[in-house]
A protein has these predicted regions:
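N-terminal, post-signal peptide beta-strand-biased segments of exported outer-membrane/organellar beta-barrel
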Residues: 17-137, 143, 149-150, 156, ...
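Residues that define the transmembrane beta-barrel architecture of outer-membrane proteins
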Residues: 48, 104-109, 198-202, 264-270, ...
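Residue-level signature of outer-membrane beta-barrel architecture
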Residues: 58, 115-117, 208, 222, ...
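Repeated loop/turn-to-beta-strand initiation elements of outer-membrane beta-barrel proteins
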Residues: 64, 119-122, 213-216, 280-283, ...
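Transmembrane beta-barrel strands of outer-membrane/channel proteins
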Residues: 68-74, 124-128, 218-222, 285-289, ...
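Solvent-exposed loop segments that connect transmembrane elements
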Residues: 84-94, 140-190, 226-261, 295-360, ...
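Detector for outer-membrane/organellar transmembrane beta-barrel domains
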Residues: 273-295, 332-348, 352-439
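Outer-membrane beta-barrel "beta-signal"
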Residues: 461-463, 504-518
């Protein structure tokens, strides 16, 4: 039972990572369909450059340029866990167990605009810079069940201490009987959670053509974050005893844990860029500074208390016909008092720590890391364009709650390459690849919020409707690697359990966009 409060932590942090993303830990880089079909756009000159290569946009023709993009994304997350206490779940006594979450974002819009005049380009961009959907875990997570399973063991241990004290004065064992907690740590519970994250980004930039070959840009992005987290763990039963009966038997929901938290915050990202083109080559770079972001909580959370545990155990004794004096003698036993006192102290301390991050009115650190993008483009002939790119995200210096970023080995590194070919005057086909490598340590991995390194492959094309309009279509799939970890849990001073976890994801994105020149 001293572990019960930690379920609250699990609920409250399950959706700390991005829902739908291509990029770093908190950065979406799939902001135009051209990326979805080619993967490498850092050195391309086009309307998508408003995000990928803002300095290069100034080399487009004079006039107005507009891009309208729509994406649909579906992602699954799965964690296989072989924790040894899971067979005690009377409703699902299987190990290893796979816990699965699903995220579906049917509409992810983005818009880019540029007006070029002379040596100047004035640009704007609206997109989801982070998040982008809702993720559901219909049956909870392994960390949830792990804590409930340990709660069941703790309840049985306390029951044993109480019954041992009762036996010393001739009373029969009550709480370790199979009609109450039993001795095996059997349990059941219901759990659900969902989370939603949207980081809206609106940027403005200016690019200037220094020479016919060199351009620079400067801009700023405003970010507004809005998040919602809801989850619960309820109907916890240990053996045949509903847990609420020893916490507050007058309220069936007294053992339930519920999180309902809305978060919002805003920040600003300065952005600079440079582009240099010579002959068949183009070189470009962009740097986004760190975004300081503080999320303010608006929460209505419900958590259990075990402050009345002794009184409720006493009431159970008396209701079973035990004289008040005998019940008082059992519960005043030094071992029983010590066990309940330690239980309450651990519970209250950990519950305070758990509530801290999602306390109503509190502001939580959630910085978006600095981001460097470098690209090279080469055009061997007019009909063929080849791009390669590199990304670096400074994740270790983007402050998050409890300085979790310090557990990373390094920031995220990405490499990409893409090619597009004009097969006819009306049709362009393209494909691309991107490798994403996170600086993950074993300590950083957590089924409540995780990423794993991956390779993404894209295909798509452009239909040139006329000289003013181009239709982009794309699909990309992300092949995630598996991250395996091992952990040892100390249940008691003399008992420990080791278990393994296997983390992975699956991601599919479809996209359609229209580029307009006028």
């Amino acid at each position: 039972m001293n572990k019960l409060n930690l379920v609250f932590v699990a609920i409250s942090t399950v959706f700390a990572g991005n829902t739908i993303q291509a990029g770093g830990l908190l950065t979406n880089t799939n902001q135009h369909v051209a990326f979805n079909r080619m993967m490498s756009r850092e050195a391309s000159i086009g309307i998508d450059g408003v995000y990928y290569n803002p300095a290069g946009v100034v080399f487009m023709n004079e006039g107005h340029h507009l891009a309208i993009n729509w994406q649909l994304a579906y992602q699954t997350r799965s964690i296989k866990n072989d924790y040894a206490l899971f067979p005690n779940n009377v409703n699902n006594p299987i190990t290893p167990r796979t816990f699965k979450g699903e995220a579906f974002a049917p509409v992810i819009p983005s818009f880019q605009y540029a007006y070029n005049k002379g040596r100047w380009s004035f640009q704007g961009n609206f997109a989801l810079t982070g998040g982008g959907g809702k993720c559901n875990f219909d049956d909870g997570l392994g960390s949830f069940e792990k804590i409930v399973s340990e709660t069941a063991v703790g309840a049985c241990q306390l029951a044993g201490i109480v019954d041992q004290a009762a036996g010393q004065i001739g009373l029969p064992a009550v709480f370790t009987s199979n009609n109450v907690f039993g001795t095996q740590g059997k349990y059941s519970y219901d759990s659900y959670m969902h989370g939603r994250q949207y980081y809206f980004g609106l940027s403005a930039a200016v690019a200037y053509k220094v020479t016919d070959n060199l351009a620079v840009s400067a801009g700023v992005r405003g970010v507004y974050a809005t998040c919602n987290y809801y989850g619960y763990v309820e109907n916890i039963t240990v053996g045949n005893m509903p847990l609420y009966k020893v916490l507050d038997p007058t309220k069936e929901n007294s053992a339930n844990i519920e999180l309902s938290c809305d978060q919002s915050g805003k920040g600003f990202t300065p952005i600079i860029g440079i582009d240099y083109k010579t002959g068949k080559w183009n070189f470009a770079a962009k740097y986004e500074f760190k975004t300081r972001l503080r999320l303010k909580n608006k929460s209505v959370n419900k958590t259990p208390s075990i402050g009345n545990l002794a009184d409720n155990l006493r009431a159970s004794y008396i209701a079973g016909g035990v004289p008040e004096a005998a019940a008082d003698m059992v519960l005043s036993n030094q071992n029983v008092q010590g066990a309940m006192g330690a239980l309450k102290n651990h519970f209250d301390k950990n519950l305070t720590e758990a509530i801290g991050e999602y306390e109503d009115g509190k502001k939580i650190a959630g910085d978006i890391p600095a981001y460097l993008a470098v690209g090279v483009g080469y055009k061997p002939i007019d009909e063929v364009r080849v791009n390669v790119g590199f990304h670096w995200f400074d994740d270790k210096h983007a402050t998050s709650y409890n300085d979790r970023q310090k557990l990373l080995d390094r920031g995220t590194v990405e490499y990409n390459a893409g090619v597009e070919v004009d097969v006819t005057k009306k049709i362009t086909l393209s494909t691309g690849w991107q490798n994403t490598n996170y600086g993950l340590s074993d300590e950083y991995m957590d089924d409540k919020s995780f990423v794993v390194s991956s390779n993404s492959v894209a295909v798509g094309g452009v239909y040139h409707i006329n000289k003013k309009m181009d239709l982009n279509v794309a699909y990309f799939h992300t092949f995630y690697k598996h991250k395996k970890t091992s952990e040892t849990v100390q249940l008691t001073p003399t008992q420990s359990l080791s278990y393994n976890s296997d983390y992975t994801r699956n991601n599919n994105v479809f996209a359609v966009g229209l580029d307009i020149n006028f």
